C-alpha cells in the first residue's frame, strides 16, 4: 500500500542528502504520492542550510504536476527548555515545523532530561511533529511524552529511516510509543526521513510498528492530503488555502 503523504524529506540543501526538489517531485509523481513536505535540517546542524533557505521556501510552487509541496523544517531541539533553532515571525511562514534530537546539537543525557526537553518543545506550541522520538540514544518516559503530545495536539513520528539507515535499535521504543498512542488516542504520523528521493513514501517498517501496536491506519496523518492539511490548520498554520482548495474532495 502506498500512502499518499510524506511529512519528512531532506534535499541537497542538507549536504548529507542527495536529491533536489525536482527529484522528489518526479519520484512522488511516479509513486502516486500526492503531498510531501520538504524539511531540511535546522541551521544549528553543521551541514544544514542557512536560515535564509527556510525564509526563501516561499518561492516553491504549492502544486507542481499534481503534487503538493509543504514548506517545512526539521528543527533541532536545543535544550531542556524546548527551544528550537528557528524562531520569530518566520516560523509562521512555514507550513510544517518538526523538531527532534540530533547528537551534534543536543548531546544525549538522561531519561529525565530528554523527557523534559521533548515535553517543553511540545508545550511551546511551535512544533507540529516530534521526529524520531524512539531514538534509543535518547530514552524517554513514554507515557509522559505521549500524554503531552495528546494534550498539545502534536503528532509523534514513527520514522522509517530509524529501522534502516540510522538510529539502530529503535524498534522497541517505537513500538512502546505506538502502543501508548493507541491507548491514549494520540496522533501518529509516519515519516520516511528520505535523504534520497528514491526513499520518499517508504513506510514499510514504520507501518509494521503501527500495525503491531493496533493503531488505526485511518488515524495516521499519511492517510490523505486533507488529513494532514486539516491537522496543520488546527495547529494554526494560515497559508494552506491553495493546497486545501486543490485537495478538498468534490461533493
Curated annotation (Swiss-Prot):
Keywords: Hydrolase, Metal-binding, Zinc. Gene3D superfamilies: Metal-dependent hydrolases (3.20.20.140). One of its GO terms (biological process) is bacterial-type flagellum-dependent swarming motility. Its EC number is 3.1.3.-. Zn(2+) 2 binds at residues 16, 41, 195. One of its GO terms (cellular component) is cytosol. SUPFAM superfamilies: PHP domain-like. SMART domains: POLIIIAc (SM00481). Zn(2+) 1 binds at residues 8, 10, 74, 193. Its cofactor is Zn(2+). InterPro entries: Phosphatase_YcdX_put, PHP_dom, PHP_phosphatase, Pol/His_phosphatase_N, Pol/histidinol_Pase-like. It is an enzyme of class 3 (hydrolase). Belongs to the PHP family. NCBIfam families: PRK09248.1. This is Probable phosphatase Sama_2233.
Amino acid at each position: 500500500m502506498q500512502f499518499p503523504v510524506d511529512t519528512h524529506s531532506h534535499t541537497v540543501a542538507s549536504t548529507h542528502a542527495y536529491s533536489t526538489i525536482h527529484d522528489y517531485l518526479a519520484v512522488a509523481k511516479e509513486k502516486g504520492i500526492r503531498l510531501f513536505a520538504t524539511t531540511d535540517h535546522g541551521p544549528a546542524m553543521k551541514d544544514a542550510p542557512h536560515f535564509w533557505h527556510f525564509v526563501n521556501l516561499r518561492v516553491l510552487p504549492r502544486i507542481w504536476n499534481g503534487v503538493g509541496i509543504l514548506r517545512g523544517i526539521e528543527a533541532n531541539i536545543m535544550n531542556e527548555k524546548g527551544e528550537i533553532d528557528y524562531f520569530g515571525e518566520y516560523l509562521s511562514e512555514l507550513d510544517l515545523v518538526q523538531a527532534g534530537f540530533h547528537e551534534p546539537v543536543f548531546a544525549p543525557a538522561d531519561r529525565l532530561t530528554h523527557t523534559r526537553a521533548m515535553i517543553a518543545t511540545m508545550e511551546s506550541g511551535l512544533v507540529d511533529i516530534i521526529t524520531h522520538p524512539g531514538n534509543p540514544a535518547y530514552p524517554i518516559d513514554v507515557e509522559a511524552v505521549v500524554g503531552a503530545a495528546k494534550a498539545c495536539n502534536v503528532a509523534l513520528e514513527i520514522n522509517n529511516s530509524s529501522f534502516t539507515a540510522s538510529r539502530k535499535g529503535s524498534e522497541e521504543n517505537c513500538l512502546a510509543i505506538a502502543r501508548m498512542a493507541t491507548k491514549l488516542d494520540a496522533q501518529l504520523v509516519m515519516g520516511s526521513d528520505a535523504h534520497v528521493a528514491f526513499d520518499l513514501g517508504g513506510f514499510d517498517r514504520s507501518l509494521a510498528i503501527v500495525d503491531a501496536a493496533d493503531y488505526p491506519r485511518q488515524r495516521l496523518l499519511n492517510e490523505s492530503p486533507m488529513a494532514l492539511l486539516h491537522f496543520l490548520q488546527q495547529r494554526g498554520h494560515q497559508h494552506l488555502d491553495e493546497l486545501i482548495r486543490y485537495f478538498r474532495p468534490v461533493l
